Swiss-Prot record:
Protein name from the UniProt record: Large ribosomal subunit protein bL9
Pfam family, one: Ribosomal_L9_N
Lineage, broadest ranks: Bacteria, Bacillati, Mycoplasmatota, Mycoplasmoidales, Mycoplasmoidaceae
Species of provenance: Mycoplasmoides gallisepticum (strain R(low / passage 15 / clone 2)) (Mycoplasma gallisepticum)
Cellular component aspect of the GO annotation: ribonucleoprotein complex; ribosome
Alphabetized GO MF terms: rRNA binding; structural constituent of ribosome
Keywords: Ribonucleoprotein, Ribosomal protein, RNA-binding, rRNA-binding
């Protein structure tokens, strides 16, 4: 029996795919748990429209990500940090500070977009921001000693 999967089913397929399964498996498990629906022409048309809509949405998100990347290019953030007599910093610059300062410039990113291994001590650092699938931007963060 041909069915359209409504949700991901391990070892069978991903949501919105058409698969062949045994009649009993479809009726007793997939339909009962609302994991699939019977394959019909109407269901196929609905599936095609859903895929087209998802692709359009993906393209729109990619375009917004490219615009955000253009905004981020050339951005320089400067911070002063306290140090001891041996020029060892008391702490580092964190994700929250960078996200907050970018939002003050009307550039909205989330901390999930920043590299999780980043540790910003005194000096100049290039911070890579992962915006969307394959779309990245780099900002310059300058950290200097507080006077």
């Amino acid at each position: 029996m041909k069915v359209i999967l409504l949700k991901d089913v391990p070892s069978l397929g991903k949501a919105d795919s058409v698969v062949n399964v045994a009649n009993g498996y479809a009726k007793n498990f997939l339909f009962k748990n609302k994991l699939a629906e019977p394959y019909t022409e109407r269901g196929q048309k609905r599936l095609d429209l859903k895929v087209i809509k998802r692709n359009e949405q993906h393209d729109l998100l990619a375009l917004e990500a490219k615009n955000l990347a253009k905004q981020l290019e050339g951005v320089v953030l400067e911070y002063d940090i306290r140090t001891n007599e041996e020029d060892k910093a008391f702490g580092t610059i964190g994700f929250k500070q960078i996200v907050d300062d970018l939002s003050k410039k009307h550039i909205f990113v989330t901390k999930d977009m920043l590299d999780s291994k980043m540790k910003l001590d005194i000096g100049e650092h290039r911070v890579k921001i992962n915006i969307f699938e394959g779309i990245h931007a780099t900002i310059l963060v300058k950290v200097s000693k507080a006077q």
